[in-house]
């Protein structure tokens, strides 16, 4: 089950039908990762810089906003609560403008990035970063979105 909370109403004027958009990205990713049949519970909060900065400071001791934060809960099994993903629309818009890419594409990328974190992937070491980015590229390609790493440095929270 995918639970989506639109905390920041500006999402509605930026992404067409944001709840459906997010649900489709997560569902596609779970299917392509061959884990949709597990029916995991995933909570997604569509937020802003104010909330993400507060959470980033509280949980990571970084007093600045970020694009995505993930909070993993359970390991993958039937109907487990995988965790929460928080996205900041403000930061995603800024980054999309800087990268000259559609906000929808960057949002897909950061949703997938957050999903992989709650599935226990990380980018702390070069090999893990390579694995995680390779999966992101594959999942984005399934959505018709080009490789985000071709012409830029990696953006991580």
Curated annotation (Swiss-Prot):
The keyword Metal-binding is annotated on this UniProt entry: yes
EC number, UniProt record: 3.1.-.-
Single GO MF descriptor: metalloendopeptidase activity
Top-level taxon of the source organism: Bacteria
Subcellular localization: Cytoplasm
Cofactor note: Binds 1 zinc ion.
Sequence positions that bind Zn(2+): 113, 117, 123
Cofactor entry: Zn(2+)
Listed GO CC annotations: cytoplasm
Coiled coil: none
Disulphide connectivity of cysteines: none
Entry-linked Pfam families: YbeY
InterPro entries: MetalPrtase_cat_dom_sf_prd, YbeY
Gene Ontology biological-process annotations: rRNA processing
Protein family membership: Belongs to the endoribonuclease YbeY family.
Entry function: Single strand-specific metallo-endoribonuclease involved in late-stage 70S ribosome quality control and in maturation of the 3' terminus of the 16S rRNA.
NCBIfam families (alphabetical): rRNA maturation RNase YbeY (TIGR00043)
HAMAP family: Endoribonucl_YbeY (MF_00009)
Protein name: Endoribonuclease YbeY
Organism name: Ehrlichia ruminantium (strain Gardel)
């Amino acid at each position: 089950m995918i639970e989506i909370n639109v905390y920041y109403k500006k999402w509605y004027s930026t992404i067409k039908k944001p709840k459906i958009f997010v649900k489709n990205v997560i569902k596609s990713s779970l299917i392509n990762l061959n884990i949709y049949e597990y029916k995991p519970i995933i909570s997604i909060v569509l937020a802003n810089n104010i909330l993400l900065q507060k959470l980033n400071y509280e949980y990571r001791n970084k007093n600045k906003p970020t694009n995505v934060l993930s909070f993993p809960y359970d390991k993958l099994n039937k109907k487990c609560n995988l965790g929460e993903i928080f996205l900041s629309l403000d930061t995603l818009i800024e980054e999309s403008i800087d990268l000259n890419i559609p906000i929808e594409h960057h949002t897909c990328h950061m949703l997938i990035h957050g999903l992989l974190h709650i599935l226990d992937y990380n980018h702390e070491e070069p090999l893990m970063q390579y694995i995680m980015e390779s999966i992101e590229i594959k999942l984005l390609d399934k959505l018709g979105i080009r490789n985000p790493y071709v012409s830029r440095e990696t953006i991580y929270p």
